[in-house]
Amino acid sequence: MARSSGSGKSTAMNIIGCLDVPTSGTYHLGGIDVSTMDDDQQAEIRNKMLGFIFQQYNLIPKLNVLENVELPLLYAGVDASERKERAMASLQRVGLADKCRNLPSQLSGGQQQRVSIARALAGSPSVILADEPTGALDSRTGREVLGFLKKLNREGDTVVLITHDNSIAVKADRIVRLQDGKIIYDGDAHDPRAVVRPEEMEQDEPAAGGFSDASPAEQEAGA
């Protein structure tokens, strides 16, 4: 999902992630209409069907790698032995099983992001939501993380990646472009229409003292 500032990305991400409901229309996830669910029902859907990867990793400093990956399974009520087994399997997928007893502070930025990917995978989600997952990484480490996400996609996982960077967006198979809360393109990532042009980026730059990414246009965007 390619976006520029104020495009409606935050609203769309919140709806896709079952953190908010659309003001109009419906949203179906895995054949289930989640657009009218209450908070508890949406929380259950999040635990069962969604995995989240954030720009800043969001690992708990006092927990080791294995405990961080187990956390969503703990919230889902999975028993201890199964939690450990599934968390270790997820760490194996991202190549960090040997770091399971390390604290986050003992890992590089790229390794911490891979731990967050393992945490997202532990619940066997239907969809993985990655919000600017390379934003806090250097270019080489960012490429490694993107490589992991592409690998997961080839293995059958659905990955929705939010980015403002054309060089990242074009690595996807499909791009959805947002502008002013509306989808203006949905299709092949290699189509010229899929790319955000420089003049559009300039138009979307906020003026000094202007609005942040959560602009009124974004707040009012529907599904």
Language-model regions: role of each:
Residues 1-172, 178:
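ABC family nucleotide-binding domain
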Residues 95, 196-197, 215:
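N-terminal non-cleavable signal-anchor helices
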Residues 182-209:
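Conserved beta-strand-loop-alpha-helix hinge in the C-terminal portion
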Residues 208, 212-217:
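Short linear motifs in low-complexity or flexible loops
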Residues 220-223:
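Short, intrinsically disordered, low-complexity terminal/loop segments
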